[in-house]
From Swiss-Prot:
This is tRNA-specific adenosine deaminase 2. Zn(2+) binds at residues 70, 106, 109. Keywords: Hydrolase, Metal-binding, tRNA processing, Zinc. It comes from Danio rerio. GO terms for molecular function: tRNA-specific adenosine-34 deaminase activity; zinc ion binding. The keyword Signal does not apply. Its EC number is 3.5.4.33. The active site is at 72 (proton donor). Its cofactor is Zn(2+).
Length: 214
């Protein structure tokens, strides 16, 4: 595992032990498997406060048709509910909470973690396309005034397993993807070229353009 965004003077008492990482990440991977079995991108997340899970989630993007329902956002909503029900100060609770997730949080989720002042994140594999903890942007540790506080990451726990689950998902046919359509107006009668746009997933995912020449 690799430490990212280390601040030795900040919240070292929250540094999870190896046994804690093993225990909580095992449960996060169980959530990721559940996501995969339900046709979602296999990401699972737990939020642990005083050795208690106060929020957990898996991706629910396809189920809810809402591109923001990432595992971390689902778990954060549960944390807010947990605090309200117990009349706890959410800010104080979040400052004592560790987040465990199977894939590096995206830029959106990393920004939410900053705003809520989550001090520690443990994650599995990197998110090379959307990662907010160093892979694309370093939302976790960059100096960003008025955006909450930076947080420390421990990266790489069971990373290969997390990657394999992602590969399994993307090899499957996405039932929510629109059917490929031929753009008739793009046919050039002179060279017979037709352009086909194929949507591989929801609108927030990649659009691949395939050019076919006769």
């Amino acid at each position: 595992m690799q430490e990212v965004g280390v601040d030795p003077e900040k919240n070292d008492f929250l540094q999870p032990s190896d046994s804690e990482v093993q225990t909580w990440m095992a449960k996060a991977f169980d959530m990721a498997v559940e996501a995969l079995e339900n046709g979602e991108v296999p990401v699972g997340c737990l939020m642990v406060y005083n050795n208690e899970i106060i929020g957990k989630g898996r991706n629910e993007v396809n189920e809810t048709k809402n591109a923001t329902r990432h595992a971390e956002m689902v778990a954060l909503d549960q944390v807010l509910d947990w605090c309200r029900l117990r009349e706890k100060d959410c800010k104080e609770v979040c400052e004592q909470t560790v987040l465990y997730v199977t894939v590096e949080p995206c830029i959106m989720c990393a920004a939410a973690l900053r705003l809520l002042r989550i001090p520690f994140v443990v994650y599995g594999c990197k998110n090379e396309r959307f990662g907010g903890c160093g892979s694309v942007l370093d939302v976790s540790s960059d100096h960003l005034p008025h955006t909450g506080t930076s947080f420390k990451c421990i990266a790489g726990y069971r990373a290969e397993e997390a990657v394999e689950m992602l590969k399994t998902f993307y090899k499957q046919e996405n039932p929510n993807a629109p059917k490929p359509k031929v753009r008739k107006d793009s046919i050039n009668p002179q060279d017979g070229a037709a352009v086909i746009q194929v949507m591989r997933g929801p609108p927030d995912e990649e659009t691949e353009t395939i050019a076919h020449l006769s």
